[in-house]
A protein has these predicted regions:
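Accessory, often C-terminal, charged low-complexity segments
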Residues: 1-10, 31-182
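A phosphate-binding catalytic loop at a beta-strand-loop-alpha-helix junction
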Residues: 11-30, 152
């Protein structure tokens, strides 16, 4: 279906009900066959698997987990079958891209300052507690990359822009190069 429906080799295919990621699998397969550079965006609510289902027994708690595993397996199978190069008939072979990123809609990764008025006898203690809670402004269950991607989204930077890790004075700095045209 993808190869028929007005698709070019650099299309972005969107699937809002991705289920087990059939569309992603098909896009990767078509790219391997014709040397295309199609990308896919799959959206799926984390619908829970029935506890009696084979998927659940295999360790998949929701449909998203099934889809991610299918994409991983599809990529691995394509590499095994086609090698790691595409464009067999092309003079210039390019590496086959089987990578993908998974994003989850969630609240901000950053703690939000509590600006409600402080009243009562222990105002200094409450203010000190609020200040101390902001020393590390990233929520405990979040990663550095969660924050990097949140900032990229807020700045309008596409999420497929490469992120580089650079060590500076024993710290990690994330470099995102994106040309903004005004």
């Amino acid at each position: 279906l993808i190869s028929i429906v007005g698709n070019t080799k650099d299309s972005i295919i969107l699937d809002f009900f991705s289920g087990s990621a059939t569309t992603a699998h098909a896009v990767m397969q078509l790219n391997a066959e014709d040397g295309g550079n199609r990308r896919f965006i799959c959206v799926q609510l984390p619908e829970l698997c029935d506890e009696k289902s084979e998927a659940y027994k295999a360790g998949y708690k929701n449909i998203c987990e099934i889809g991610k595993e299918r994409i991983r397996r599809a990529g691995k199978k394509i590499i095994e079958e086609k090698g790691d190069q595409i464009g067999i008939d092309d003079e210039e072979k390019k590496p086959l891209d089987i990578g993908f990123k998974v994003f989850k809609l969630d609240t901000s990764n950053l703690r939000i300052w509590d600006n409600t008025p402080i009243t009562g006898d222990n105002q200094i203690e409450m203010f000190t507690e609020r200040m101390n809670s902001m020393i590390d402004s990233i929520k405990d269950d979040r990663t550095d990359m969660d924050v990097v991607y949140e900032v990229m989204l807020k700045m309008g930077v596409p999420l497929d822009v490469p992120v580089q890790y650079i060590g500076v004075n024993e710290k990690v700095v994330y470099k995102v190069v994106y040309k903004v045209v005004h």
